[in-house]
């Protein structure tokens, strides 16, 4: 057998044996349900009788993962290292190649008890926030409109259309392909003839400006050769820079377990800010599966595993108040913006937004954004004529966003909507701005207490049979939101105990389920009295 093949075979065999040695089965208590592990599993939470194995080493389903599971009976599981979890006949099953995972910690009797205990023990809040503008105004991203054709003329036109159509300016993000190549942080001169002036004009319009960046470096570029010589790239067992396959091809990648590489990268970004007036960065990539290879050699040593690279990438963002992430490992309670993974343009995707946001909160990611209004997966927008969009879907998606911690536009509503639907979406942007002070207040409270901003009814009102409700949420302690997430104009709403005032000013008695009419322009929300 070839030496390299034998080495890989033995490594795999060792991993399998080790995993078998450290299996933990956790029988469920009567009525116990579990949440956690991965933001993208939100729609499956609370987990049912069966859940296929989810490996935190090499899977993230395009979003944040964390080694935390919490139950509605006040128990939680935490491990500093990644593990595989599944549910078998209602019981939680854990596999770890490192060491046995201890039995669940009993912290109380509710989901909130479990979360708070885990949070205080393992990811207490930093006391800091991303910039307040994330919470108080809508965000705008150029991705869906420009995709890989980012350019100065169209970026400015997009921003001008935002203002011209009566939307409040906020943060604007210039997405991928503004740069000459990966690892380079200069604008393409043919597309951006005067980027400094562009940023100046965007600032004059009232925007803060962020740029898309990633940890990848185009092979056979000047940056690649320089970084390789400095030892700032992740290598393989041949001591050569490892080539990683990702969604834009194959590239080398920074090794941020090397503090000198980290400081070098931050210095490059600071240079971009100084040269062009950029306010911050959208940090894409960093997914655990890119680093899950047995032949990778990192500066941090043999104990480094895939998720350690994900965390090292996330730690960069702490240097920039204007930041955004999609992939994550641990880092709950930190002042990082965490966006949901790219969602399709579909009703099914609209229905995923609320449970995924609830899941993000239960992993400690309070400062979260529910992807882009209408969807952020560009492939699902290809080939659709502007006149063929489901306009109701865009409106309902905007309504879900409006009373979340953040809302982000990408597809231009004024391009695809008629006057009636455009007005409905614009009203949601203005509603978010109106609620901005309260949302920021919730964020500041979260920075102190560590509590999620978006809370499920089970979290806020335990032991009322609310575990399965995933189309309503509490925005802080004061408001409950119940939007339409399917085509139609009516829905049932669960009112928890107490008195509630709805968006139309009516006072309602809680502790019951009501059926309400939800015309296109209505976002039902309820203030707790």
Positions of predicted regions on the chain:
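Bacterial Sec-dependent N-terminal signal peptides
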Residues: 1-22
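Catalytic and substrate-binding clefts that recognize carbohydrates or anionic sugar/phosphate headgroups
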Residues: 21-134, 152-164, 460, 517-529
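Generic recognition of flexible, low-complexity loop/linker segments
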Residues: 55-57, 64-66, 127-129, 160-162, ...
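Short, hydrophobic/amphipathic alpha-helical patches that form generic packing surfaces
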Residues: 64-74, 359, 395-408, 441, ...
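Short, glycine-/Ser/Thr-/acidic-enriched flexible segments
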Residues: 75, 82-84, 145, 179, ...
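N-terminal small/glycine-rich loop or linker at the start of catalytic domains
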Residues: 130-145, 240-253
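Carbohydrate-binding surfaces of carbohydrate-active enzymes
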Residues: 161, 165-166, 188, 198-208, ...
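Aromatic- and carboxylate-enriched substrate-binding clefts and catalytic-loop regions
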Residues: 168-425, 458-461, 476
């Amino acid at each position: 057998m070839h030496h390299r093949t034998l080495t890989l075979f033995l490594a795999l065999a060792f991993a399998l044996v080790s995993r078998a040695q450290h299996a933990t089965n956790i029988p469920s208590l009567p009525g116990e349900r579990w949440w956690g592990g991965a933001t993208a599993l939100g729609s499956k939470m609370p987990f049912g009788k069966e859940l296929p194995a989810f490996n935190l080493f090499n899977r993230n389903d395009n979003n944040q993962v964390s080694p935390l599971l919490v139950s509605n009976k006040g128990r939680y599981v935490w491990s500093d290292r990644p593990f595989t979890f599944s549910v078998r006949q209602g019981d939680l099953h854990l596999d770890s190649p490192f060491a046995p995972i201890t039995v669940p910690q009993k912290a109380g009797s509710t989901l909130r008890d479990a979360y708070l205990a885990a949070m205080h023990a393992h990811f207490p809040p930093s006391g800091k926030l991303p910039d307040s503008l994330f919470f108080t105004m809508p965000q705008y991203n150029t991705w869906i409109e420009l995709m890989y054709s980012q350019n100065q003329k169209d970026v400015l036109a997009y921003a001008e259309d935002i203002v011209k159509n009566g939307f409040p300016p906020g943060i604007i993000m210039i997405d991928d392909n503004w740069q000459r190549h990966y690892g380079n942080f200069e604008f393409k001169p043919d597309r951006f003839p005067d980027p400094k002036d562009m940023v100046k004009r965007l600032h004059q319009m009232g925007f803060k400006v962020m740029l898309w960046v990633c940890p990848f470096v185009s092979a056979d570029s000047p940056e690649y050769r320089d970084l390789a010589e400095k030892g700032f790239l992740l290598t393989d067992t041949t001591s050569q820079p490892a080539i990683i396959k990702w969604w834009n091809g194959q590239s080398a990648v920074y090794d941020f377990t090397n503090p000198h590489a980290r400081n070098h990268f931050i210095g490059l970004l600071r240079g971009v800010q100084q040269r062009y007036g950029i306010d911050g960065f959208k940090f894409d990539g960093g997914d655990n599966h890119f680093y899950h290879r047995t032949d990778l050699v990192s500066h941090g040593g043999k104990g480094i595993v895939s998720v350690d690279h994900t965390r090292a990438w996330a730690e960069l963002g702490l240097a920039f108040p204007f930041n955004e992430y999609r992939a994550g490992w641990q880092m709950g309670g930190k002042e990082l913006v965490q966006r949901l993974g790219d969602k399709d343009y579909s009703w099914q995707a609209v229905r995923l937004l609320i449970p995924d946001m609830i899941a993000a909160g239960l992993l400690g990611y309070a400062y979260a954004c529910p992807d882009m209004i209408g969807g952020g997966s560009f492939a699902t927008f290809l080939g659709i004529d502007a006149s063929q969009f489901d306009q109701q879907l865009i409106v309902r998606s905007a309504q879900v966003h409006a009373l979340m911690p953040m809302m982000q536009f990408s597809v231009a509503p004024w391009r695809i909507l008629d006057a009636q639907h455009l007005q409905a979406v614009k009203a949601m942007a203005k509603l978010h701005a109106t609620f901005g002070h309260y949302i920021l207040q919730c964020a500041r409270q979260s920075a102190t207490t560590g509590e999620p901003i978006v809370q499920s009814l089970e979290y806020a009102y335990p032991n009322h049979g609310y575990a399965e409700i995933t189309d309503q949420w509490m925005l802080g302690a004061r408001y409950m939101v119940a939007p339409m997430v399917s085509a139609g104009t009516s829905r049932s709403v669960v009112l928890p105990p107490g008195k509630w005032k709805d968006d139309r000013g009516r006072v309602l008695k809680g502790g019951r389920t009501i059926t309400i009419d939800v015309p296109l322009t209505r976002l039902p929300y309820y203030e707790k009295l």
